[in-house]
Swiss-Prot record:
It catalyses: dCTP + H2O + H(+) = dUTP + NH4(+). GO terms for molecular function: dCTP deaminase activity; nucleotide binding. This is dCTP deaminase. InterPro entries: dCTP_deaminase, dUTPase-like_sf, dUTPase_trimeric. Pathway: Pyrimidine metabolism; dUMP biosynthesis; dUMP from dCTP (dUTP route): step 1/2. The gene is dcd. Residues 169-193 are annotated as: Disordered. It comes from Escherichia coli O139:H28 (strain E24377A / ETEC).
């Protein structure tokens, strides 16, 4: 069962759930909390690689990722990031989220943006128990026109679901947690699997 707005506010008040900066009550709706777009992005560079062998040797996968992923792009206030049709880009939420070991979160895109062709997450919309950090957004423009994305705009909504008990291996205690405490648009770390 997902938390309702009253429960989300109570969990925030009690410090069991942390969203920083804390959203105003106007952004806590029914069963979700609206989140905004941060100012950090990462894209694929123009490249000539025919493919990335994801099951290849880790050092080769790492080198291929380094060749195709851009450095982090940080926008100044008022600047826009343009996502063209057929392009994939990474970004982050403005908010940093910390979940306890007995709560899982879910990210959903906004219907109004989806109707323009913007996918906010390609597959990864679960936020693990014990997670702490900004949420990485996997943008894809499936529409026909470039989309101007500006830091601070409403980009998605989080919902939260209590678990039957605390997870034995929450994200923040796992040795193999590749994205622990991420604050920026961290590129794929599949080479760390």
């Amino acid at each position: 069962m997902r938390l309702c707005d009253r429960d989300i506010e109570a969990w925030l008040d009690e410090g069991r759930l942390s969203i920083n900066p804390r959203p105003p009550v106007e952004r806590i709706n029914g069963a979700t909390v609206d989140v905004r777009l941060g100012n950090k992005f990462r894209t694929f560079r123009g490249h000539t690689a025919a493919f990335i062998d994801l099951s290849g040797p880790k050092d080769e996968v790492s080198a291929a990722l380094d060749r195709v992923m851009s450095d982090e792009i940080v926008l100044d206030e008022g600047e826009a990031f343009y996502l063209h049709p057929g392009e994939l880009a990474l970004a982050v939420t403005l908010e940093s989220v910390t979940l306890p070991a007995d709560l899982v979160g879910w990210l959903d895109g906004r219907s109004s943006l989806a109707r323009l062709g913007l996918m906010v997450h390609v597959t990864a919309h679960r936020i693990d128990p014990g997670w702490s950090g900004c949420i990485v957004l996997e943008f894809y423009n499936s529409g026909k026109l470039p989309l101007a994305l500006r830091p601070g705009m409403l980009i998605g909504a989080l919902s939260f679901e209590p678990l039957s008990g605390p997870a034995a291996r929450p994200y923040n205690r796992r040795e193999d947690a590749k994205y622990r405490n991420q604050q920026g648009a961290v590129a794929s770390r599949i080479d760390k699997d």
